[in-house]
């Protein structure tokens, strides 16, 4: 959940949705979907990946089922494959239509969000595999936590330090929600450790501006989580170990996130529920 008072819907100038992907690194361009909001920041960032001179492209997260956005995203060299960071609708709702527009298979960790196209198979993504497409090496990283199927994509050849498309695992502004019941704080912290080990690579998030040092961002995220857990422990007091009921979630949310804006209250409750379950597991 983003800090209170943060304007989650402002659009960075470099990400304005003009209908044409804007280059953000040597190998990645972004087309911003027209779906700004409290949970999507300035909107979902659909990424277009290709090596210089490549005749095909890779698209990551087609985004919402918006015809104008999908048509603009499909315009250009042939899309070889579509990759999905996780199952949420702001990333996947347009995937089936985009597969029809481009003839490109859609691959996701969750088989329910894989779409074959024009007899081209769409196998589920596997953590640890390397995809070779559009002149690129794309390393698939299983990074569950935000959701159980959350996946990141490492481009080791993108500039001197590479880049990582982090989906909603690491955002360009604020911090992400652990989407209960599918998400897991324990898994999320493990995923942060894995991302930090990559080093000072460029962060290409699904929401918010790109960032310069993944390892530094991850350290900030971990400090934020530790601080929130300390607040939750304090709010629990002598109720530590009690069953995680909705009444307990409400009480802790009011104590820890009392100043959160109304549009983010549901996300705050999800985060509290995830933290309570984490503590109940013996953290």
Predicted segments, located by residue:
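Actinobacteria-biased recognition of intrinsically disordered, low-complexity terminal regions
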Residues: 1-20
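Conserved beta-strand hairpin/beta-sheet module of binuclear metal-dependent hydrolase folds
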Residues: 14-75, 152-167
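Active-site HxH/HxHxD metal-binding segment of metal-dependent hydrolases
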Residues: 37-43, 62-139, 158-162
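Metallo-beta-lactamase
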Residues: 54-59, 64-66, 137-235
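Histidine-centered divalent metal-coordination motifs
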Residues: 85-91, 146, 207, 275
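C-terminal regulatory/interaction regions
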Residues: 236-283
């Amino acid at each position: 959940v983003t800090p209170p008072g943060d304007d989650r819907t402002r659009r960075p100038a470099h990400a304005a949705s003009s209908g044409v992907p804007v280059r953000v690194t040597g190998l990645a361009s972004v087309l911003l979907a027209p779906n700004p909001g409290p949970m999507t920041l300035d909107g979902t960032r659909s990424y277009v990946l290709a090596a210089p001179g490549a005749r095909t492209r890779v698209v990551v997260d087609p985004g919402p089922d918006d015809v104008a956005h999908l048509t603009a995203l499909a315009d250009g060299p042939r899309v070889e494959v579509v990759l999905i960071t996780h199952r949420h609708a702001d990333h996947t709702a347009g995937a089936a239509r985009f597969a029809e527009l481009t003839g490109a298979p859609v691959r996701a960790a969750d088989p329910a969000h894989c779409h074959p196209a024009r007899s081209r198979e769409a196998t589920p993504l596997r953590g640890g595999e390397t995809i070779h497409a559009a002149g690129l090496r794309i390393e698939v990283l299983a990074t569950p936590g935000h959701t159980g199927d959350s996946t990141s994509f490492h481009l080791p050849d993108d500039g001197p330090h590479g880049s990582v498309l982090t989906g909603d695992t690491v955002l360009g502004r604020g911090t992400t929600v652990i989407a209960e019941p599918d998400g897991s704080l324990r898994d999320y912290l493990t995923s942060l450790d894995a991302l930090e080990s990559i080093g000072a690579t460029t962060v290409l998030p699904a929401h918010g501006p790109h960032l310069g040092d993944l390892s530094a961002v991850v350290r900030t995220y971990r400090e934020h989580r530790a601080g929130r857990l300390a607040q939750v422990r304090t709010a629990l007091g002598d109720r530590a170990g009690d069953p995680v009921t909705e009444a307990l979630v409400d009480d802790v949310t009011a104590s820890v996130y009392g100043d959160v804006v109304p549009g983010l209250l549901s996300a705050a409750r999800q985060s509290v529920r995830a933290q309570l379950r984490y503590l109940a597991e013996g953290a």
